[in-house]
Amino acid sequence: GRLGLSSLGRLESHTLATLDAVLAVLHQLAAKPWSGRQIEETFADFDLGASLLDRNAREALGEIPDGRRVRIMVTMPSEAANDPDLIKDFLLRGMNIMRVNCAHDGPEEWERMVDHLRRAESETGRPCKIAFDLAGPKLRTGPVSPGPGVIRWKPVRNELGQVTTPAMVAFCAQGESPETHMLAIPVKGLIFEHAQRGDVIELTDTRGRERLLHVVDVDESACICTNDRTGYVVQGTRLRLLRGADLVCEDEVGALPELERSLSLSAGDDLILTSVDIPGRPAVQNEDEVVYRPAQIGCSLREVFTDARPGERIFFDDGKIGGVIRAVRRDEEGERLEVKITHAVNGTAKLRAEKGINLPDTRLRVSALTEKDRQDLEFACKHGDLVSLSFVRRPQDVAELIQALETLAAEQMGIVLKIENRLAVEALPQLLLTAMQRQVISVMVARGDLGVEIGFERMAEIQEEILWLCEAAHVPVIWATQVLESLAKRGLPSRAEVTDAAMSGRAECVMLNKGPHIALALDFLGDVLTRMKGHQTKKSALMRKLSLAENALQ
């Protein structure tokens, strides 16, 4: 402040030295004796903190890349197993750590990815670490019973509602499909063998609307028809082949693949969460549209039914649907949770199979290391440099991983603690102290689940606190989840994503996820991090010469 003393606003990497120096000066100003360290004795510690963090980051995440201070971690898509050029391209564009998600693919695919990377390293002369991300306990929705198969065709219309291109469908034998990419409808009989150009196939669709499809082409395996109306057919829909006023033959639609269904949920709805072996189903209503049997869906983790309590919150599909547990039932019908839905995005949201479940208030008594994780860990120790622990919540989870690594004689393996739930945030000091028994550790701010668990409104605050605490512990941080996601998926970043990418430069590493435009995102992120290198490090502005100010004086 006015005395020229430190505001304590940027003391993380040298906390004790800063406090000692400020106290020493205050005692001198107050003409009081000071028994602690003198100011000159703290000088070395100011530089030591930053150098310790830099050393730990180099050991855990690799050397600092040319031109920037921050490493880039890239998640491997499945196609990388069969595309060595893709991995080489990532490496040339600035990838410093290759992330393999053990929740996808398998050891054969992972080994090919590793081989491709090692070959690319040899060809380019660029080193790259490998991180294996353990899947952890699977907490997801179970399957939903499929609905009846249905096929819909629809013509193309202009802005005036006029048909510009009629719908084209091909009636073909069951199990066959036309060589063209048009919509195929299987039939039980051989209507296509009797059809001729100019014929009409008459049917009544699922909505009771008559449709006349005009035959425009016929070959030995299909008859191709056009129609300028939308239509829906299911298995058993009757077909009548007409030639002028004459009926040539009759047929019916054959077996159709069952449709994947979803549950439509709105605020105020009831939802039953059951064990995963019971298929989910939508709510059932009576003739007055009153629900007499609520929607239900399975949960993949059985410990939920023993550890969850009434009044606790529950979220589905990255927070798109939220609710409160009203009751926990265990009887002859099995274990289940009765949930009252409290919010759904856009008023009504669809819940599908294999969507994430978050229970921020529930203390689940389940190990962060599953049996599959232990098998994957053995592979990771042979081929990788880092292993990321998912679903970590307690110091015991970290201790179990350390013990498993010692059993595998993999003391050199780096540990990444994924902070992705509320309990991990609350226990972060204890998690760090446990992990710091090892020399090579880092922390990942996994903002996907973390945002759901702690609330999106607290996300900015919590990620800052994680950065500060880890800097005080001299532990490197990986900034992860949805970094430049719009750019990676759609080829164009949002404005907020650009700011987020710039802010990520205060961590030691930034993680990019998968997407069709990931190479573009890799270039973009590297450019942003290179530009921000001269402007800021951690919380400190570097006071680089500003081009804007220079231009203003011209």
What do the PLM-derived regions correspond to, one by one?
Residues 1-554:
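Non-catalytic helical/linker scaffolds that mediate oligomerization, partner binding
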